Amino acid sequence: MKTKTHRTPTRSDRSIVQLVAHCACILAIVSITSRGVLEAADDQKQSELEASYFSPPIQVTQGLTKAGEGYFSPDSTRICYQGVPQGYPFYQIFTQPFDMQSPQPTSAQRISPGRGRTTCSYFSPDNQKLLFASSHLDPNMQQTEDAAINQAKEDAQSGRRRRYQWDFDPYSDIFAFDFDSKSLTRLTNAPGYDAECSFSADGKTIVFVSDRDGDPDIFLMNADGSGVRQLTNVPGYDGGPFFSPNGKWITFRSDRIEKDMLHIHVMRSDGEGDQALTDGKSVQWAPFWHPTKPWMIWTGADHSDPEKRPNYDLYLMRYSVDGDNFIPGPTIRMTDHPGADVLPVFSPDGNHLMWTASRSSDRVSQLWFSTINLDALELSLNRAAALSLPQQQ
């Protein structure tokens, strides 16, 4: 485990991190209508690039002010996600039935208690539990809610649209909801922010983020909340961790290379072998593993030109592993439409993709689903690899 100088991060330290820690760069927030699946806006139609990689995206959530950060259940019969209910200022956690053969919005069931900020839901591998982070035990909940509601009213009157920002809520803890007993078990109870949690493939270990040591770092704990151990200990934000399918690696995002410039990292599941996979004046975040292929997908945007608005798109990397060495390979861009495409996840069979976007005509952030063309992606990765080879003289 690496060491660092202890510090307490400030709001300015976290300006970009707060922007993208969960559902960043989502476009305008307006109430969704009661219509069926919304039509894609004219400027959001699928491009030639996108059409070569995946089927026309289908919106699979509606009825909430906005929704995002979705994940499939292990058997692909449900999805979980966070959404903002009508008339309430904070995200709550929902699940809904899902038909892979006929994807469409269905009736959502709220799983979280209904108050406070909630985020980062994730199914257990045995499909019996749902992890999520929640601040519903905030002792000042009424004041917290009132402040957010009053701010929303002021913004509505003035027409102001605030940049998306997620607070590192000091009352956020990790909970596990049991689908059979309908009980909620608290797994963390340390001062500060605990969130951004997911299971290992065997269901025995949870990887999560906590700022209990002064800034957000990555930790492990047993599935029952015991045996907490720290993996990263370097100044800056480390977050959004996920185990590889074989449990030997963890990918995450970090701004330790340069303040506010998030990049994709990978390390072994014991915290050793930490390395950055991306670099430069860009924000790269929300990495997620393909379940069967040596691929990793994430969201990225160029931030090198301060006069240019960054556009977040999806990128796919092929990697290889040689013993304890993780070797990044060619990377291709998968989306190129004008809005933000963020938080991509593969289905358990690896044939489908779900992500957060604002592709409907009303520009509300929702979850979208597509079937991916594995052969086309493999071919493009092969071409990218060939172009990166040294040219013979």
PLM features: what roles do these ranges have?
Residues 1-17:
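N-terminal secretory signal peptides that target proteins for export/translocation
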Residues 14, 25-27, 152-156:
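Residue-level detector of bioactive/disordered segments in secreted/extracellular proteins
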Residues 3-5, 19, 40, 392-393:
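Intrinsic disorder/low-complexity segments enriched in polar/small residues
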Residues 5-7, 21, 369:
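Intrinsically disordered, low-complexity segments enriched in glycine/proline and serine/threonine
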Residues 38-393:
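Sequence signature of WD/YWTD-type beta-propeller architectures
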Residues 16-19, 204:
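Low-complexity, intrinsically disordered segments with a bias for serine/threonine
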